[in-house]
From Swiss-Prot:
The gene is acyP. It is an enzyme of class 3 (hydrolase). It comes from the Bacteria. This is Acylphosphatase. It catalyses: an acyl phosphate + H2O = a carboxylate + phosphate + H(+).
Length: 92
């Protein structure tokens, strides 16, 4: 299956609630590559590459988030697959 790449910005109560770790663990379980980081505006940004079905499952999980979070919305951009990531990581 051909991989896809998405860049997502998550807004709401998503910092200080374990959202990056949740994003990371979910991506690892789905065998995706990419990264996640907090933004200064209080949002979380992430990029993921992998098979369409796994990326869609990951996005569905991000819409819910971990129990302490309150996701207000996701902005999702499709990007060109670059294949530059070896794993999924948390960036600081």
């Amino acid at each position: 299956m051909k991989p896809i790449r998405v860049k997502v910005k998550v807004n709401g109560r998503v910092q200080g609630v374990g959202f990056r770790h949740f994003t990371y663990k979910t991506a690892i379980s789905l065998e995706l590559t990419g990264w996640v980081r907090n933004l200064e505006d209080g949002c979380v940004e992430a990029v993921a590459e992998g098979p369409r079905q796994q990326v869609e499952e990951w996005l569905a999980a991000l819409k819910k988030g971990p129990p302490a979070s309150k996701v207000a919305g996701l902005t999702i951009q499709r990007e060109i697959v670059e294949g530059v990531f070896e794993r999924f990581e948390v960036r600081f």
